[in-house]
Amino acid sequence: MEVKTFAFLQIAVIIALGLHLAPAGSNQLSGPQSSANSNDAVFCDTNCTQGTDGAWSGCRGDCFCVHVGNSTEGRCIELIGDFDYSTPGAED
């Protein structure tokens, strides 16, 4: 009986410590998911379509077309933030 009680108390203490220590992390913004490094994808006002030649049309400015699967219709979106589209080794 004493062994069961002692084991139960050990488990209770471990759970209590785990619940107490889990939220004890830093509250500073850091890492790739912080708002200081965030990027946004914004829908533009236009839709886009795929022509018979396979080219997409309908997006203006910095917007580009996104579509789902084999659909010939899509939405124009714009990516806002610090995106690096450079090709590795292109500056050699």
From Swiss-Prot:
It is found in: Secreted. Keywords: Disulfide bond, Glycoprotein, Secreted, Signal. Disulfide bonds join 44-63, 48-65, 59-76. GO terms for cellular component: extracellular region. Transmembrane segments: none annotated. It comes from the Eukaryota. One of its GO terms (molecular function) is C-X-C chemokine binding. Glycans are attached at residues 47, 70. Residues 1-24 form the signal peptide. Salivary chemokine-binding protein which binds to host chemokines CXCL1, CXCL2, CXCL3, CXCL4, CXCL5, CXCL6, CXCL10, CXCL11 and CXCL13. This is Evasin P675.
